[in-house]
């Protein structure tokens, strides 16, 4: 009986310390890879069998938009969409940090300053 318990204890310990891998990212295979580059823009697509995906399109003016996604180590689906244009790179996604709200005292101070513009000084030399 003691040997029986010891065998199961060793097997349980081995199972507990064995590395668990959701996927083998090193050996991931590309399922889709396409690229279409034209005089008026481009389109690209990438799909990998480990849940990584990427798509992008661009136009003749240098603007681009697209998306990329993957599964985080915590198992969360991460999805980022973006636009890149004259206003810069603008990503959007639930996992991206957002700035904290402006404190109420600052909001009130800004509203007061807007409601009470400073009068120009007479006689000031510029």
UniProtKB/Swiss-Prot annotation:
One of its GO terms (molecular function) is structural constituent of chitin-based larval cuticle. One of its GO terms (cellular component) is chitin-based extracellular matrix. The keyword Magnesium does not apply. Coiled coil: none annotated. The keyword Cell membrane does not apply. Residues 39-100 form the Chitin-binding type R&R domain. Keywords: Cuticle, Signal. Residues 1-16 form the signal peptide. Component of the larval cuticle. This is Larval cuticle protein 2.
